[in-house]
Amino acid sequence: MPPRNDRPSDRNVPRKSAVREARNASSRPKAFYWLLGAIVLVGVAALSYVAIRPKGGPTDVIQTADTTNAGPSQGYLMGKVDAPVKILEFADFECPSCAGFSVVTEPDVRTRIIDTGLASITYFDFPLTQHRNTLAASNAAACADEQGKFWPMHDRLFQAQDEWNGEATDSPKPFFKRYAQEVGLDVAKWESCYDARKYQKRIGANLADGLRRGVNSTPSFVIGNKLYRGMASYDAMKAIVDSIAKSTSSPLVNGAPAAVPTKTK
């Protein structure tokens, strides 16, 4: 999700100009008090916005989906099944940092890591209770997967997170239904699946898998059996993938890495 334009310098522009106006208005007491009131209102509004706006860091976990008897996890694969490096992403569709990774970083990851065969990425649901509409979003994406369209729906959900999240609406389904049409789904079949909450156990199993792996915030990534928390940059992820690929690609001779021949002069 693109960052909000809430830089202190932007918020302070009207405040500073109002102060200058007030200082020059000593001969106009009515104007002075009007401007003073405006300053107070601007300050209150700015503080309120800072207090309620989504934070950019990882979102702490609170268990949501039912993980009882959930069975084995089943994520959503992108890339080759036999890719040398496996990236497991545990994310929440309503998590701002997850949207940031999807919109800002993941396009490069896909074209320069996944599409080139260096690694695969598998998405696992990790819904959080403080996000009111996230289970519904996971359900919408799972039903899109039934028609082979998980990733287009995944992308659309993150791109449009601002309009369907729990702070924006109590009824996300109309938005999801529109996205289903936009990504080319049979909307009637998708809606039947969505209304039945057909994949709730799958979502719960994915959450349970993350908990077993020690995931406690979103987004989190498991790469080479190591857990990384927070929104990763492309460069950081590429370095990890390259390191794992290098450590596993050396040929073995009698169980030991083969000697690397040196150039002769």
What role is predicted for each listed range?
Residues 21, 54-55, 167-168:
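Short leucine-rich amphipathic alpha-helices used at interfaces
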Residues 71-73, 159, 223:
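Residue-level signal for pocket-adjacent positions within structured domains
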Residues 54-67:
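Ser/Thr/Pro/Gly-rich low-complexity linker/stalk segments immediately outside membranes or between
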Residues 2-51, 106, 177-265:
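C-terminal cap of thioredoxin/glutaredoxin-like
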Residues 83, 88-181, 213, 251-262:
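Structural alpha/beta surface segment adjacent to cysteine/selenocysteine redox centers
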Residues 79, 88, 229:
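Residue-level detector of conserved, well-ordered beta-strand and adjacent loop positions
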Residues 68-85, 113:
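A short beta-strand-turn-helix
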